[in-house]
Amino acid sequence: RLRSRGLGDVYKRQMYTVIKRMEVSAAHSLKLSYRSKCENLHGHNWIITVYCRSKELNADGMVVDFSHIKQVVKEQLDHHNLNEVLSFNPTAENIARWICDQIPTCFKVEVQESESNIAVYEED
């Protein structure tokens, strides 16, 4: 309910959030300071969840077009060896931050490489 505050005050505090979830199949090997089977090339069916927010909508009435998020993530990562397309050690944490950096309205990314392993990057 709107009380004694004017509509302008209410809209100033509102935030739009969109969430895009997609699956990406990709391979990688990790460069680690300790021995691990993850140093060998292996793959995941990653579940990537991208969170975007904005106080205002763009000219098309969106925070960001869902297809833009999909394009950025899928074209760069899907069915690739991540060591060949990314310039950093492709840990789930690093991938989450990289995705967040690619999308201007993004503030949080979850990278799930298995049922029990999820990395989250979130900006303040």
What are these model-predicted stretches?
Residues 1-14:
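Single conserved hydrophobic/aromatic residue that forms the stacking wall/gate
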Residues 13-124:
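Charge-rich, low-complexity N-terminal segments
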